[in-house]
Amino acid sequence: MSDKPDARPSARLSAVTLDDASIGHSSADIDHERATAIWDLIEDNSFAPCGDPGEGPYTLHISLMESRLVLDIKRESGEQVVQHHLSLTPFRKVVKDYFLVCESYYNAIRSASPSQIEAIDMGRRGLHNEGSTLLQERLEGKVDLDFDSARRLFTLICALHWKG
């Protein structure tokens, strides 16, 4: 876990995919949000499996399997590097709270004052930060990633729960 990106240009993700079976059918708006989150992560990230003797860049396939988050990490060539299975239990509360605040935020945009919208958005960002920190902690010793990359990855974990 680090606050600054790894200095190696190879310590990064070049592709990220979400398992279709894990996300199910969704609206065009939700599909667009997921695609944007993936693009943001690929554009700017620091990501390296701990103890990997090889070089990146890496590809990441994210799925849900038996109530576990599966991070399947490979090299661009397709060579398997590692697959991590993380329990979703530690994420349940923060993801649930995050969705509740997001729903409040989207409802507030239609009718609330700018100060109310800002207050809700601050809460949303705080929960997003909490989820990102939790993700970094759960990946400690498994994957080295900076906070901004953890934020973008947390967005995608939420996307797996956001089935439209």
Swiss-Prot record:
Disulfide bonds: none annotated. It comes from the Bacteria. InterPro entries: UCP032146. NCBIfam families: PRK02853.1. Belongs to the UPF0262 family. HAMAP family: UPF0262. This is UPF0262 protein Xaut_1232.
